[in-house]
């Protein structure tokens, strides 16, 4: 599953989009200052709107934060956890993250990722697990080949960002929960960058990388090849060794010098056999530790933030995505100069973006139009839309700003109670 248009994520900075619009060949020099003013107003409006969102979700998370004092289970209810997850879902979808299904996570072959090894996870430790991702693209990555003797480059489907939300099960084994470093009753959030789709399981705190069957076969084969000749020498002389031991323990009679020499030789071979076994076990353990280190390096070195620290980034990402969508939809509709149907505007935005930035996106036109209608920046006539003239658009933004600031100042920060200007 690889496609550049995997989700609604716009993989270009807002400043680049603004610069491209302000230098559009259809934008006159007289309109350029007003278009620049409009983007600033849009940024202010969505910042104000998402201020309410930020305060609301942070308040919901206070009782669920595992980083609060103590290490005892948190006394939280199912309803409390459910409300938080629903609000988190809204924020992430606004930031163009897409929830991944269990099948997508389970079917991802960990042997096709950067780790190139099987990953085992005790999922019974968790009562709720949610993966969100955005920006799937093929990334050229160097991976080990021939047991690390060579490296080769290959294209691996990789997400730009991944959010992992998990809640430990209240009925899970306390030993397993403690081993995973979790706290029951809490909600955990982890934000990652540049994670291969095949390595999603590596993000679990109790993930364990397995030594490959090929490596196990090599260790087993070398043990057999070296150990069988030693074992063949030990077995015939084992009776002599036992007799010598019995004599020294006083169980049997005296030991002849010839038997003693044979016993010493047998003991030496036996020690070599035991040493071989220990060496092979150390070899297996070393490869196992190497896999765990790679697991930690690849997954957790790409961790951007955890728990309460994720909210500022995610809310800012949501705000940024909303501004980019609304500004592109309005600006390109305005520069087109004629009313357009929603589907035509969608194609127009995607074509312009590909021509300007060389990237394919799946523009979320219905959401963009809904935002512009809410802010009174477009006029609907039947199934067509036209942009409000720039001076009027700025005037409507000013009015919306006043309404939003008054609502938040006097009515609290609940997002569903925010009002907008309707001409």
Regions found by a protein language model. Give the residues of each.
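Minor-groove-contacting beta-hairpin "wing" of winged helix-turn-helix DNA-binding domains
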Residues: 384-389
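Short acidic, hydrophobic short linear motifs in intrinsically disordered regions
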Residues: 337-356
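Soluble catalytic regions of membrane-associated enzymes that act on cell-envelope
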Residues: 358-370
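Short, amphipathic alpha-helical interaction segments positioned at domain boundaries
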Residues: 390-423
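A short, conserved structural fragment
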Residues: 369-383
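Basic, amphipathic N-terminal segments
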Residues: 1-223
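Short alpha-helical segments that sit at the start of domains
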Residues: 293-339, 361
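Transmembrane alpha-helical hairpins and terminal membrane-anchor modules
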Residues: 213-298
């Amino acid at each position: 599953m690889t496609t550049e248009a995997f989700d609604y994520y716009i993989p270009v900075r807002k400043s680049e989009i603004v610069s491209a619009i302000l230098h559009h060949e259809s934008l006159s020099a007289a309109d350029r200052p007003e278009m620049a003013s409009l983007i600033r107003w849009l940024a202010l409006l969505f910042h104000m709107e998402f201020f309410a969102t930020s305060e609301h979700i942070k308040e919901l998370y206070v009782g669920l934060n595992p980083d609060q004092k103590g290490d005892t289970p948190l006394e939280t209810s199912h309803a409390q956890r459910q409300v938080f997850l629903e609000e988190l879902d809204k924020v992430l979808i606004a930031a163009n993250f897409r929830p991944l299904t269990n099948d997508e996570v389970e079917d991802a072959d960990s042997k096709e990722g950067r780790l190139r090894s099987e990953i085992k996870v005790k999922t019974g430790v968790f009562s709720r697990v949610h993966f969100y991702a955005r920006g799937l693209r093929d990334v050229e990555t160097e991976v080990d080949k021939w047991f690390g003797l060579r490296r080769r480059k290959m294209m691996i489907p990789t997400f730009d960002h991944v959010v992992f939300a998990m809640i430990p099960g209240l009925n899970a084994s306390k030993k397993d929960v403690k081993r995973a470093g979790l706290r029951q009753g809490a909600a955990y959030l982890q934000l990652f960058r540049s994670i291969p789709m095949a390595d999603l399981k590596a993000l679990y705190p109790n993930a364990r990388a397995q030594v490959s069957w090929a490596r196990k076969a090599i260790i087993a084969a070398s043990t057999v090849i070296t150990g069988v000749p030693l074992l063949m020498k030990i077995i015939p002389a084992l009776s002599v060794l036992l007799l010598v031991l019995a004599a020294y323990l006083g169980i049997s009679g005296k030991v002849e010098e010839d038997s003693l020499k044979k016993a010493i030789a047998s003991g030496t071979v036996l020690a070599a056999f035991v040493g071989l076994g220990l060496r092979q076990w150390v070899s297996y353990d070393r490869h196992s530790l190497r896999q765990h280190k790679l697991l930690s390096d690849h997954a957790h070195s790409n961790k951007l933030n955890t728990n309460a620290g994720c909210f500022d980034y995610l809310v800012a990402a949501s705000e940024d995505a909303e501004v980019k969508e609304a500004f592109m939809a309005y600006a390109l509709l305005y520069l087109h100069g004629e009313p357009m149907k929603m589907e035509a505007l969608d194609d127009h935005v995607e074509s312009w973006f590909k021509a300007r930035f060389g990237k394919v996106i799946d523009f979320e036109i219905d959401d963009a139009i809904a935002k512009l209608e809410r802010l009174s920046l477009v006029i609907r006539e039947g199934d067509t839309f036209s942009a409000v003239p720039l001076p009027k658009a700025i005037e409507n933004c000013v009015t919306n700003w006043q309404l939003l600031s008054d609502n938040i100042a006097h009515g609290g920060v609940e997002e569903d109670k925010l009002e907008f200007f309707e001409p």
